[in-house]
């Protein structure tokens, strides 16, 4: 008789409950070939252990919530906030603790030093599978701050949506004398889910779904009149290692030379067509040597965009290596067409 791994069964059930599956009993029976009574015993024990709780006619993961409210009066230090309030809730394996220490202090530093906020709050939503942390400030708003910086430093008037796009590559900062602009980039890559919301605009590398917006915790903060919300989520049992994420994009001997761009997220509508869009993308990536362009969700691109990026861009910036991934046939054909046409001229 096959011995069932009880921890594996439990985690399987928890995953189904988290995803909202109503048929978790049948699915577990089919997956592990165990009886219905055995599944109910697992569920009952998890309820006793405080991992799940009843919600009308089904179960949900039990979430513990903690809130902290801070005055940004010039005395705050992100490390002190983490050690005093946050670390007591982050008691996992060393790799996860390290990720939270890095991510939280990076994002809290942004709120303290760049937001011009009077008040900063931290909310923690924790269940047996994941931990989510919100950092919310009532300041100028991250995208409006970028917009103001571009106007004052370059005399460029850009939309808030364009301000979002400047964050994808990494290295962008409104205070080069103090910061490298790497915090958001690496935090967004090491987290399972990373979202910045401000003034009705989102920055995220994730496949942002309406269900995330409809999440009660996130939606309640979307009603704020000004400021910035940073949402970070990672599995309590994540296998990610912070140093490996850094080494992927910033090898020790070379520095931060690699980046990846989710093209669909970078441009309004997700299907870039113009030369000006390509030029803006090039401006973001020219500081890197190795660039991966992720075309997930992009259904088509314009001839002008493709020519400006893959032909003229390569001529103007010969040091950059452009690699594409997850291209559909339409996009792939357009890229090949402009490159091949250029080669015979």
Report the location of each language-model feature.
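Helical mechanochemical/support elements of P-loop NTPase systems and associated helical scaffolds
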Residues: 160-163, 183, 277, 305-306, ...
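Short, glycine-/small-residue-enriched flexible loop/hinge segments at domain edges that mediate gating
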Residues: 267, 288-301
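A short acidic (Asp/Glu
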Residues: 207, 302-307, 333-335
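Short, non-transmembrane amphipathic alpha-helical segments
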Residues: 305-316
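Short, surface-exposed connector motifs at secondary-structure boundaries
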Residues: 22-23, 287-292, 318-320
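A short acidic, amphipathic alpha-helical/loop segment
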Residues: 186, 280, 308-309
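Bergerat-fold GHKL ATPase/HATPase_c domain
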Residues: 1-105, 114-121, 238-282, 321-345
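Conserved beta-strand-loop-beta-strand hairpin that lines the nucleotide-binding pocket
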Residues: 53-67, 112-242
């Amino acid at each position: 008789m096959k011995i069932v791994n009880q921890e594996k069964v439990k985690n399987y059930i928890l995953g189904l409950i988290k995803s909202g599956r109503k048929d978790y009993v049948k699915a577990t029976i089919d997956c592990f070939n165990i009886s219905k009574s055995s599944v109910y015993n697992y569920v009952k024990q998890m309820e006793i252990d405080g991992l799940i709780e009843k919600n009308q006619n089904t179960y949900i993961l039990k979430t513990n919530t903690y809130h902290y409210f801070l005055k940004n009066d010039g005395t705050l230090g992100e490390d002190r906030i983490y050690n005093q309030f946050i670390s007591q809730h982050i008691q996992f394996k060393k790799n996860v603790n390290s990720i939270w220490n890095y991510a939280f202090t990076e994002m809290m530093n942004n709120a303290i030093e760049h937001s011009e906020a009077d008040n900063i709050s931290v909310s923690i939503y924790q269940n047996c599978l994941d931990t989510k942390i919100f950092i919310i400030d009532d300041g100028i708003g991250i995208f409006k701050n970028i917009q103001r910086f571009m106007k004052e430093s370059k005399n460029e008037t850009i939309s808030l949506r364009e301000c979002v796009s400047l964050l994808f590559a990494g290295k962008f900062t409104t205070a080069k004398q103090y910061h490298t602009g790497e915090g958001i980039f690496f935090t967004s890559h090491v987290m399972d889910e990373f979202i910045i919301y401000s003034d009705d605009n989102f920055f995220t590398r994730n496949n942002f779904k309406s269900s995330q917006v409809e999440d009660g915790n996130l939606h309640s903060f979307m009603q704020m009149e000004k400021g910035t919300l940073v949402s970070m989520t990672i599995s309590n049992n994540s296998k990610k290692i912070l140093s490996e994420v850094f080494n992927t994009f910033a090898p020790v001997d070379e520095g931060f030379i690699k980046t990846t761009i989710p093209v669909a997220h970078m441009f309004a509508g997700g299907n870039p067509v113009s030369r000006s869009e390509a030029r803006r993308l090039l401006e973001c990536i020219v500081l890197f040597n190795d660039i991966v362009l992720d075309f997930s969700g992009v259904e088509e691109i314009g001839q002008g965009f493709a020519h400006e990026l893959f032909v003229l861009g390569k001529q103007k910036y010969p040091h950059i290596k452009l690699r594409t991934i997850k291209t559909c046939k339409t996009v792939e054909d357009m890229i090949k067409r402009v490159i091949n046409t250029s080669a015979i001229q």
